[in-house]
Amino acid sequence: MTLSIITINRNNAVGLEKTLASVAAQTFKEFEYIVIDGASIDESAEVIKAHETEFAHLKWVSEPDMGIYNAMNKGLKMASGNYIQILNSGDCLVADDVIERMTQALQEKGYPNILYGNMVKCFPDGRRLVDKGFAGQEITMLGMYTGTLNHDSAYIRRDLFKKYGYYDETLRIVSDWKWYLQVIIFGGEQPQYVDMDVTLFDMEGFSETNKDLAKVERKKVLEQMLPSAVLADYDQFASPMDQFKRLQRHPLAYRIVWFMERCLFKMEKAQNKKNKTAQWN
């Protein structure tokens, strides 16, 4: 098993320094590290040069690109590892032995096409939230309609990009989600999960503008990939299903709502019976 880690960066020298330091500190050293810098005008290139000797297999370029996913695709085409991890500038590996433990997990699980762990979201106010994604549950279209697989905490077989294609560079926010949609939902590739914190994800740059654009792009992708009648059902029922799943995680609240629903059902049943009796009379 060989691994290629890809970091993309543009004008984020401070974040890049954190990312490079976390990767350089790994106890497992035999991986390929690829840094794609988008012709930054800050100190990013100097940061990379300062860390060059810390990596056994480092490739890096600093040149103009056409956006995040264009940069990712550049890195993918340069990669030679069996597995890929994309770790964006500003994000870090949670501990010095993460790669070592993830490679062990790959072996234990029979080298699946995709293995993912947990992503720890780091907020500007100091809060941290562990995002386990689907946490090993079967990933369905309903789950992908509102959720996604966090790509920075996933190890992906490089061959999957040859089979399903690279990231859609016409999208600015959700191309990784679209790729997972194609691979998991339409391609039938079910990822494996390990309950391990893998990455620290910097939430500081995630704005409401990004959220709004992500919604617009998701809708565009779904309209392209799903029949309109099917999409209409997901539009109508996805939110109630999320609410139902949330209730299931809280047994007392679930029992209260279940009891109320049963009461409403019996009331409606009695009313329907009364209406039918009135019709016969």
Regions found by a protein language model. Name each.
Residues 1-211:
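Nucleotide-sugar donor-binding/catalytic module of glycosyltransferases
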Residues 52, 209-215, 246-255:
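Short, charged low-complexity intrinsically disordered segments located at boundaries
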Residues 75, 184-188, 206-207, 222-225, ...:
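Short amphipathic alpha-helical patches
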Residues 95, 176, 180-181, 214, ...:
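Solvent-exposed, non-transmembrane amphipathic alpha-helical segments
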Residues 97-105, 226-230, 281:
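Peripheral/terminal regions associated with large enzymatic or DNA-binding modules
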Residues 196-197, 201-204, 208-234:
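Catalytic core of nucleotide-sugar-dependent glycosyltransferases
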Residues 227-228, 233-281:
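Membrane-proximal basic amphipathic "stem/tether" segments
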